[in-house]
Every structure is written in C-alpha cells, then in structure tokens.
Amino acid sequence: MMCYDNSEMLSRLIDVMANDKPLMLTSPKQRQGSRFEQRACEFLQERGLILVAQNWQQPKVGELDLVMLEKGQAWSTLVFVEVRQRQHSYFGDAAISVTAGKQRKIIKAARHFLQQNPQYHKYECRFDVIAYNTMNKKNKNEANITLDNQPNQRLEINQPEWLQGAFITSAW
C-alpha cells in the first residue's frame, strides 16, 4: 500500500512520489526517516485514517510528517502525526525525543496548515506520535531495514507505538 496525498481533500498538492520513484533525499538519515514515515502512514491507513498530507512544509516554520483524517460517527478529527525512530539507547525511547520545543514547532506548523486549508477549520484537532524503537540486529536472514550509511548494520523493527493525543495546545 502506498501513501499518496488525497487531492480531493488537500487544496495544495504535495508530490512525495514522482513517477512512483521516491524523492531524492540528501542524507541517509532523511531517507531512513522517509521509510519510517511511509510505514507509519500505512499503519494508520490500516486503522481507518485517511491521508490528507505527507511531509507538509511551511518555510521558516516547520514540517508536518503526516496529516490524517479520522472519521467518527459524531464528528471527524484532523490528526497531526509526528513520526519518530530511535535506536535503543540509555537516553530514552523515540517518543521521549519529541521535546517541548519540537511540540511547539509542530503546533505552529499545524496553525499554518489550518490557515492555508480553511476546509478543516471546524474539525477537532489532535496531535499524535508514532514511535519506532529499533535495535541493531545480527541475524541477516530476518526481515529488516538496512541502514544507508552502514550497509552491514540492520534494524529490527518493532511494532510502532501509537500515542494518541500525545500532547495538546492550550488555544488556537
């Protein structure tokens, strides 16, 4: 399953996959992050969320990894999703890496997204985090992802941790 922007819902199209080829990202870290964002998008779509935008950017403000729509019976919710991946460390897991400063940047970018997409003004909004905690793995026969900058290292991918309502904002 591929994640493409839903052109019926988004007023400004974002071409993340040109001619079915991924964008050329400059660093191995960016390429790896893009793969985890793709996995998170597929994970959320399997749970019924609809992709509105992926890698939405506002210059000098910030980026939103995923913007999803969760349709409910009474109302729908616009979900701003931050995707984080971190290898096992003693400094905390992937979810903890979404600092207060990062939360402020995401909230600011979400405000700009809503200003540029007035069709979502009346929606409830929620800020979620999808966290992937990975470990280096020695068995090369198992399903894994190869690190771009370290071809002999492989990551063991755990199920994502989906933190719904991971943080809130006091007022829009």
From Swiss-Prot:
GO terms for molecular function: nucleic acid binding. Gene3D superfamilies: 3.40.1350.10. Pfam families: UPF0102. Belongs to the UPF0102 family. This is UPF0102 protein Pcryo_2198. It comes from Psychrobacter cryohalolentis (strain ATCC BAA-1226 / DSM 17306 / VKM B-2378 / K5).
